[in-house]
């Protein structure tokens, strides 16, 4: 099981109930767990996703012990594991861009390879259809937050093989939109679409779609797909998270435009 967890970066775990995973984990001898430090990293991230922070921190201590005691780890791989541990710990600082970036920079300095515990084609937005809604945390600080995103994301991309690429661009586009700068928002939106083309960042593409929907209410723009076409495209990917995000944005659009009978 630990070999599978390590290889598929938590995809299998996401289909299981947290209680089931914890039950198996509690039955696994500590000595066996220590032989699979990459699996421990994946489990740490899953515990964060499941809001089980105490277990996440417990696994972190187990990982550090594994790195110290593992007889066959090279110094390079020890650095990679410690860096990836920093990366996963950064989630605990969500949504403080500066504090998250401190961990990303630390990880970037230690790592010589992309992270294994995070798949580059996995979700980046924790189910949110908006990067701005995720990371704008204080009134009056938006420009500062945008600059922080521009500075920190390259470090994150380096250690995750481009996971979430385009996040800073779509956040900038959303900022223009919220300030009523619709032309600038449209330009930045098209830049974001171009940036993510073909790179598998579906969660960022959905953020782009949500902004395109909102922009279409305020100015005459042509969306890339009809709602029906886009939903059909997402269904072909067999990922219910993407479909649910899209349905939520459609519900928002239809509510704002008074088409309540079309709300999914």
Where are these regions (language model features)?
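Short, well-ordered secondary-structure microsegments
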Residues: 1-48
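Short coil/turn residues that cap or connect secondary-structure elements
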Residues: 13-16, 160, 200, 238
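Internal alpha-solenoid helical repeat scaffolds
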Residues: 31-208
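Long, internal scaffold/assembly segments composed of regular secondary structure
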Residues: 182-264
């Amino acid at each position: 099981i630990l070999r599978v967890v390590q290889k598929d970066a938590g995809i299998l775990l996401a289909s299981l109930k947290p209680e089931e995973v914890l039950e198996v984990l509690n039955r696994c001898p500590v000595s066996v767990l220590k032989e699979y430090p990459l699996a421990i990293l994946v489990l740490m991230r899953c515990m964060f996703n499941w809001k089980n922070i105490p277990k996440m921190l417990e696994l972190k201590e187990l990982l550090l012990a594994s790195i110290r005691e593992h007889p066959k780890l090279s110094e390079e791989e020890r650095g990679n594991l410690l860096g990836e541990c920093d990366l996963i710990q950064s989630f605990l600082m969500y949504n403080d861009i500066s504090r998250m970036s401190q961990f990303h920079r630390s990880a970037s300095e230690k790592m010589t390879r992309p992270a294994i515990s995070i798949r580059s084609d996995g979700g980046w937005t924790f189910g949110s259809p908006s990067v701005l809604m995720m990371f704008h945390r204080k009134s009056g600080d938006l420009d500062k937050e945008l600059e922080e995103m521009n500075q920190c994301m390259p470090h994150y991309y380096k250690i995750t093989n481009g996971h979430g690429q385009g996040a800073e661009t779509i956040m900038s586009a959303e900022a223009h939109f919220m300030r009523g700068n619709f032309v600038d928002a449209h330009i930045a939106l098209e830049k974001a679409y171009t940036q993510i083309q073909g790179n598998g960042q579906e969660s960022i593409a959905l953020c782009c779609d949500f902004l395109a929907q909102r922009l279409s209410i305020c100015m005459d723009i042509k969306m890339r797909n009809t709602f029906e076409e886009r939903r059909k495209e997402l269904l072909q990917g067999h990922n219910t998270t993407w479909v649910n995000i899209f349905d939520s944005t459609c519900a928002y659009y239809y509510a704002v435009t008074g088409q309540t009978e079309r709300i999914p």
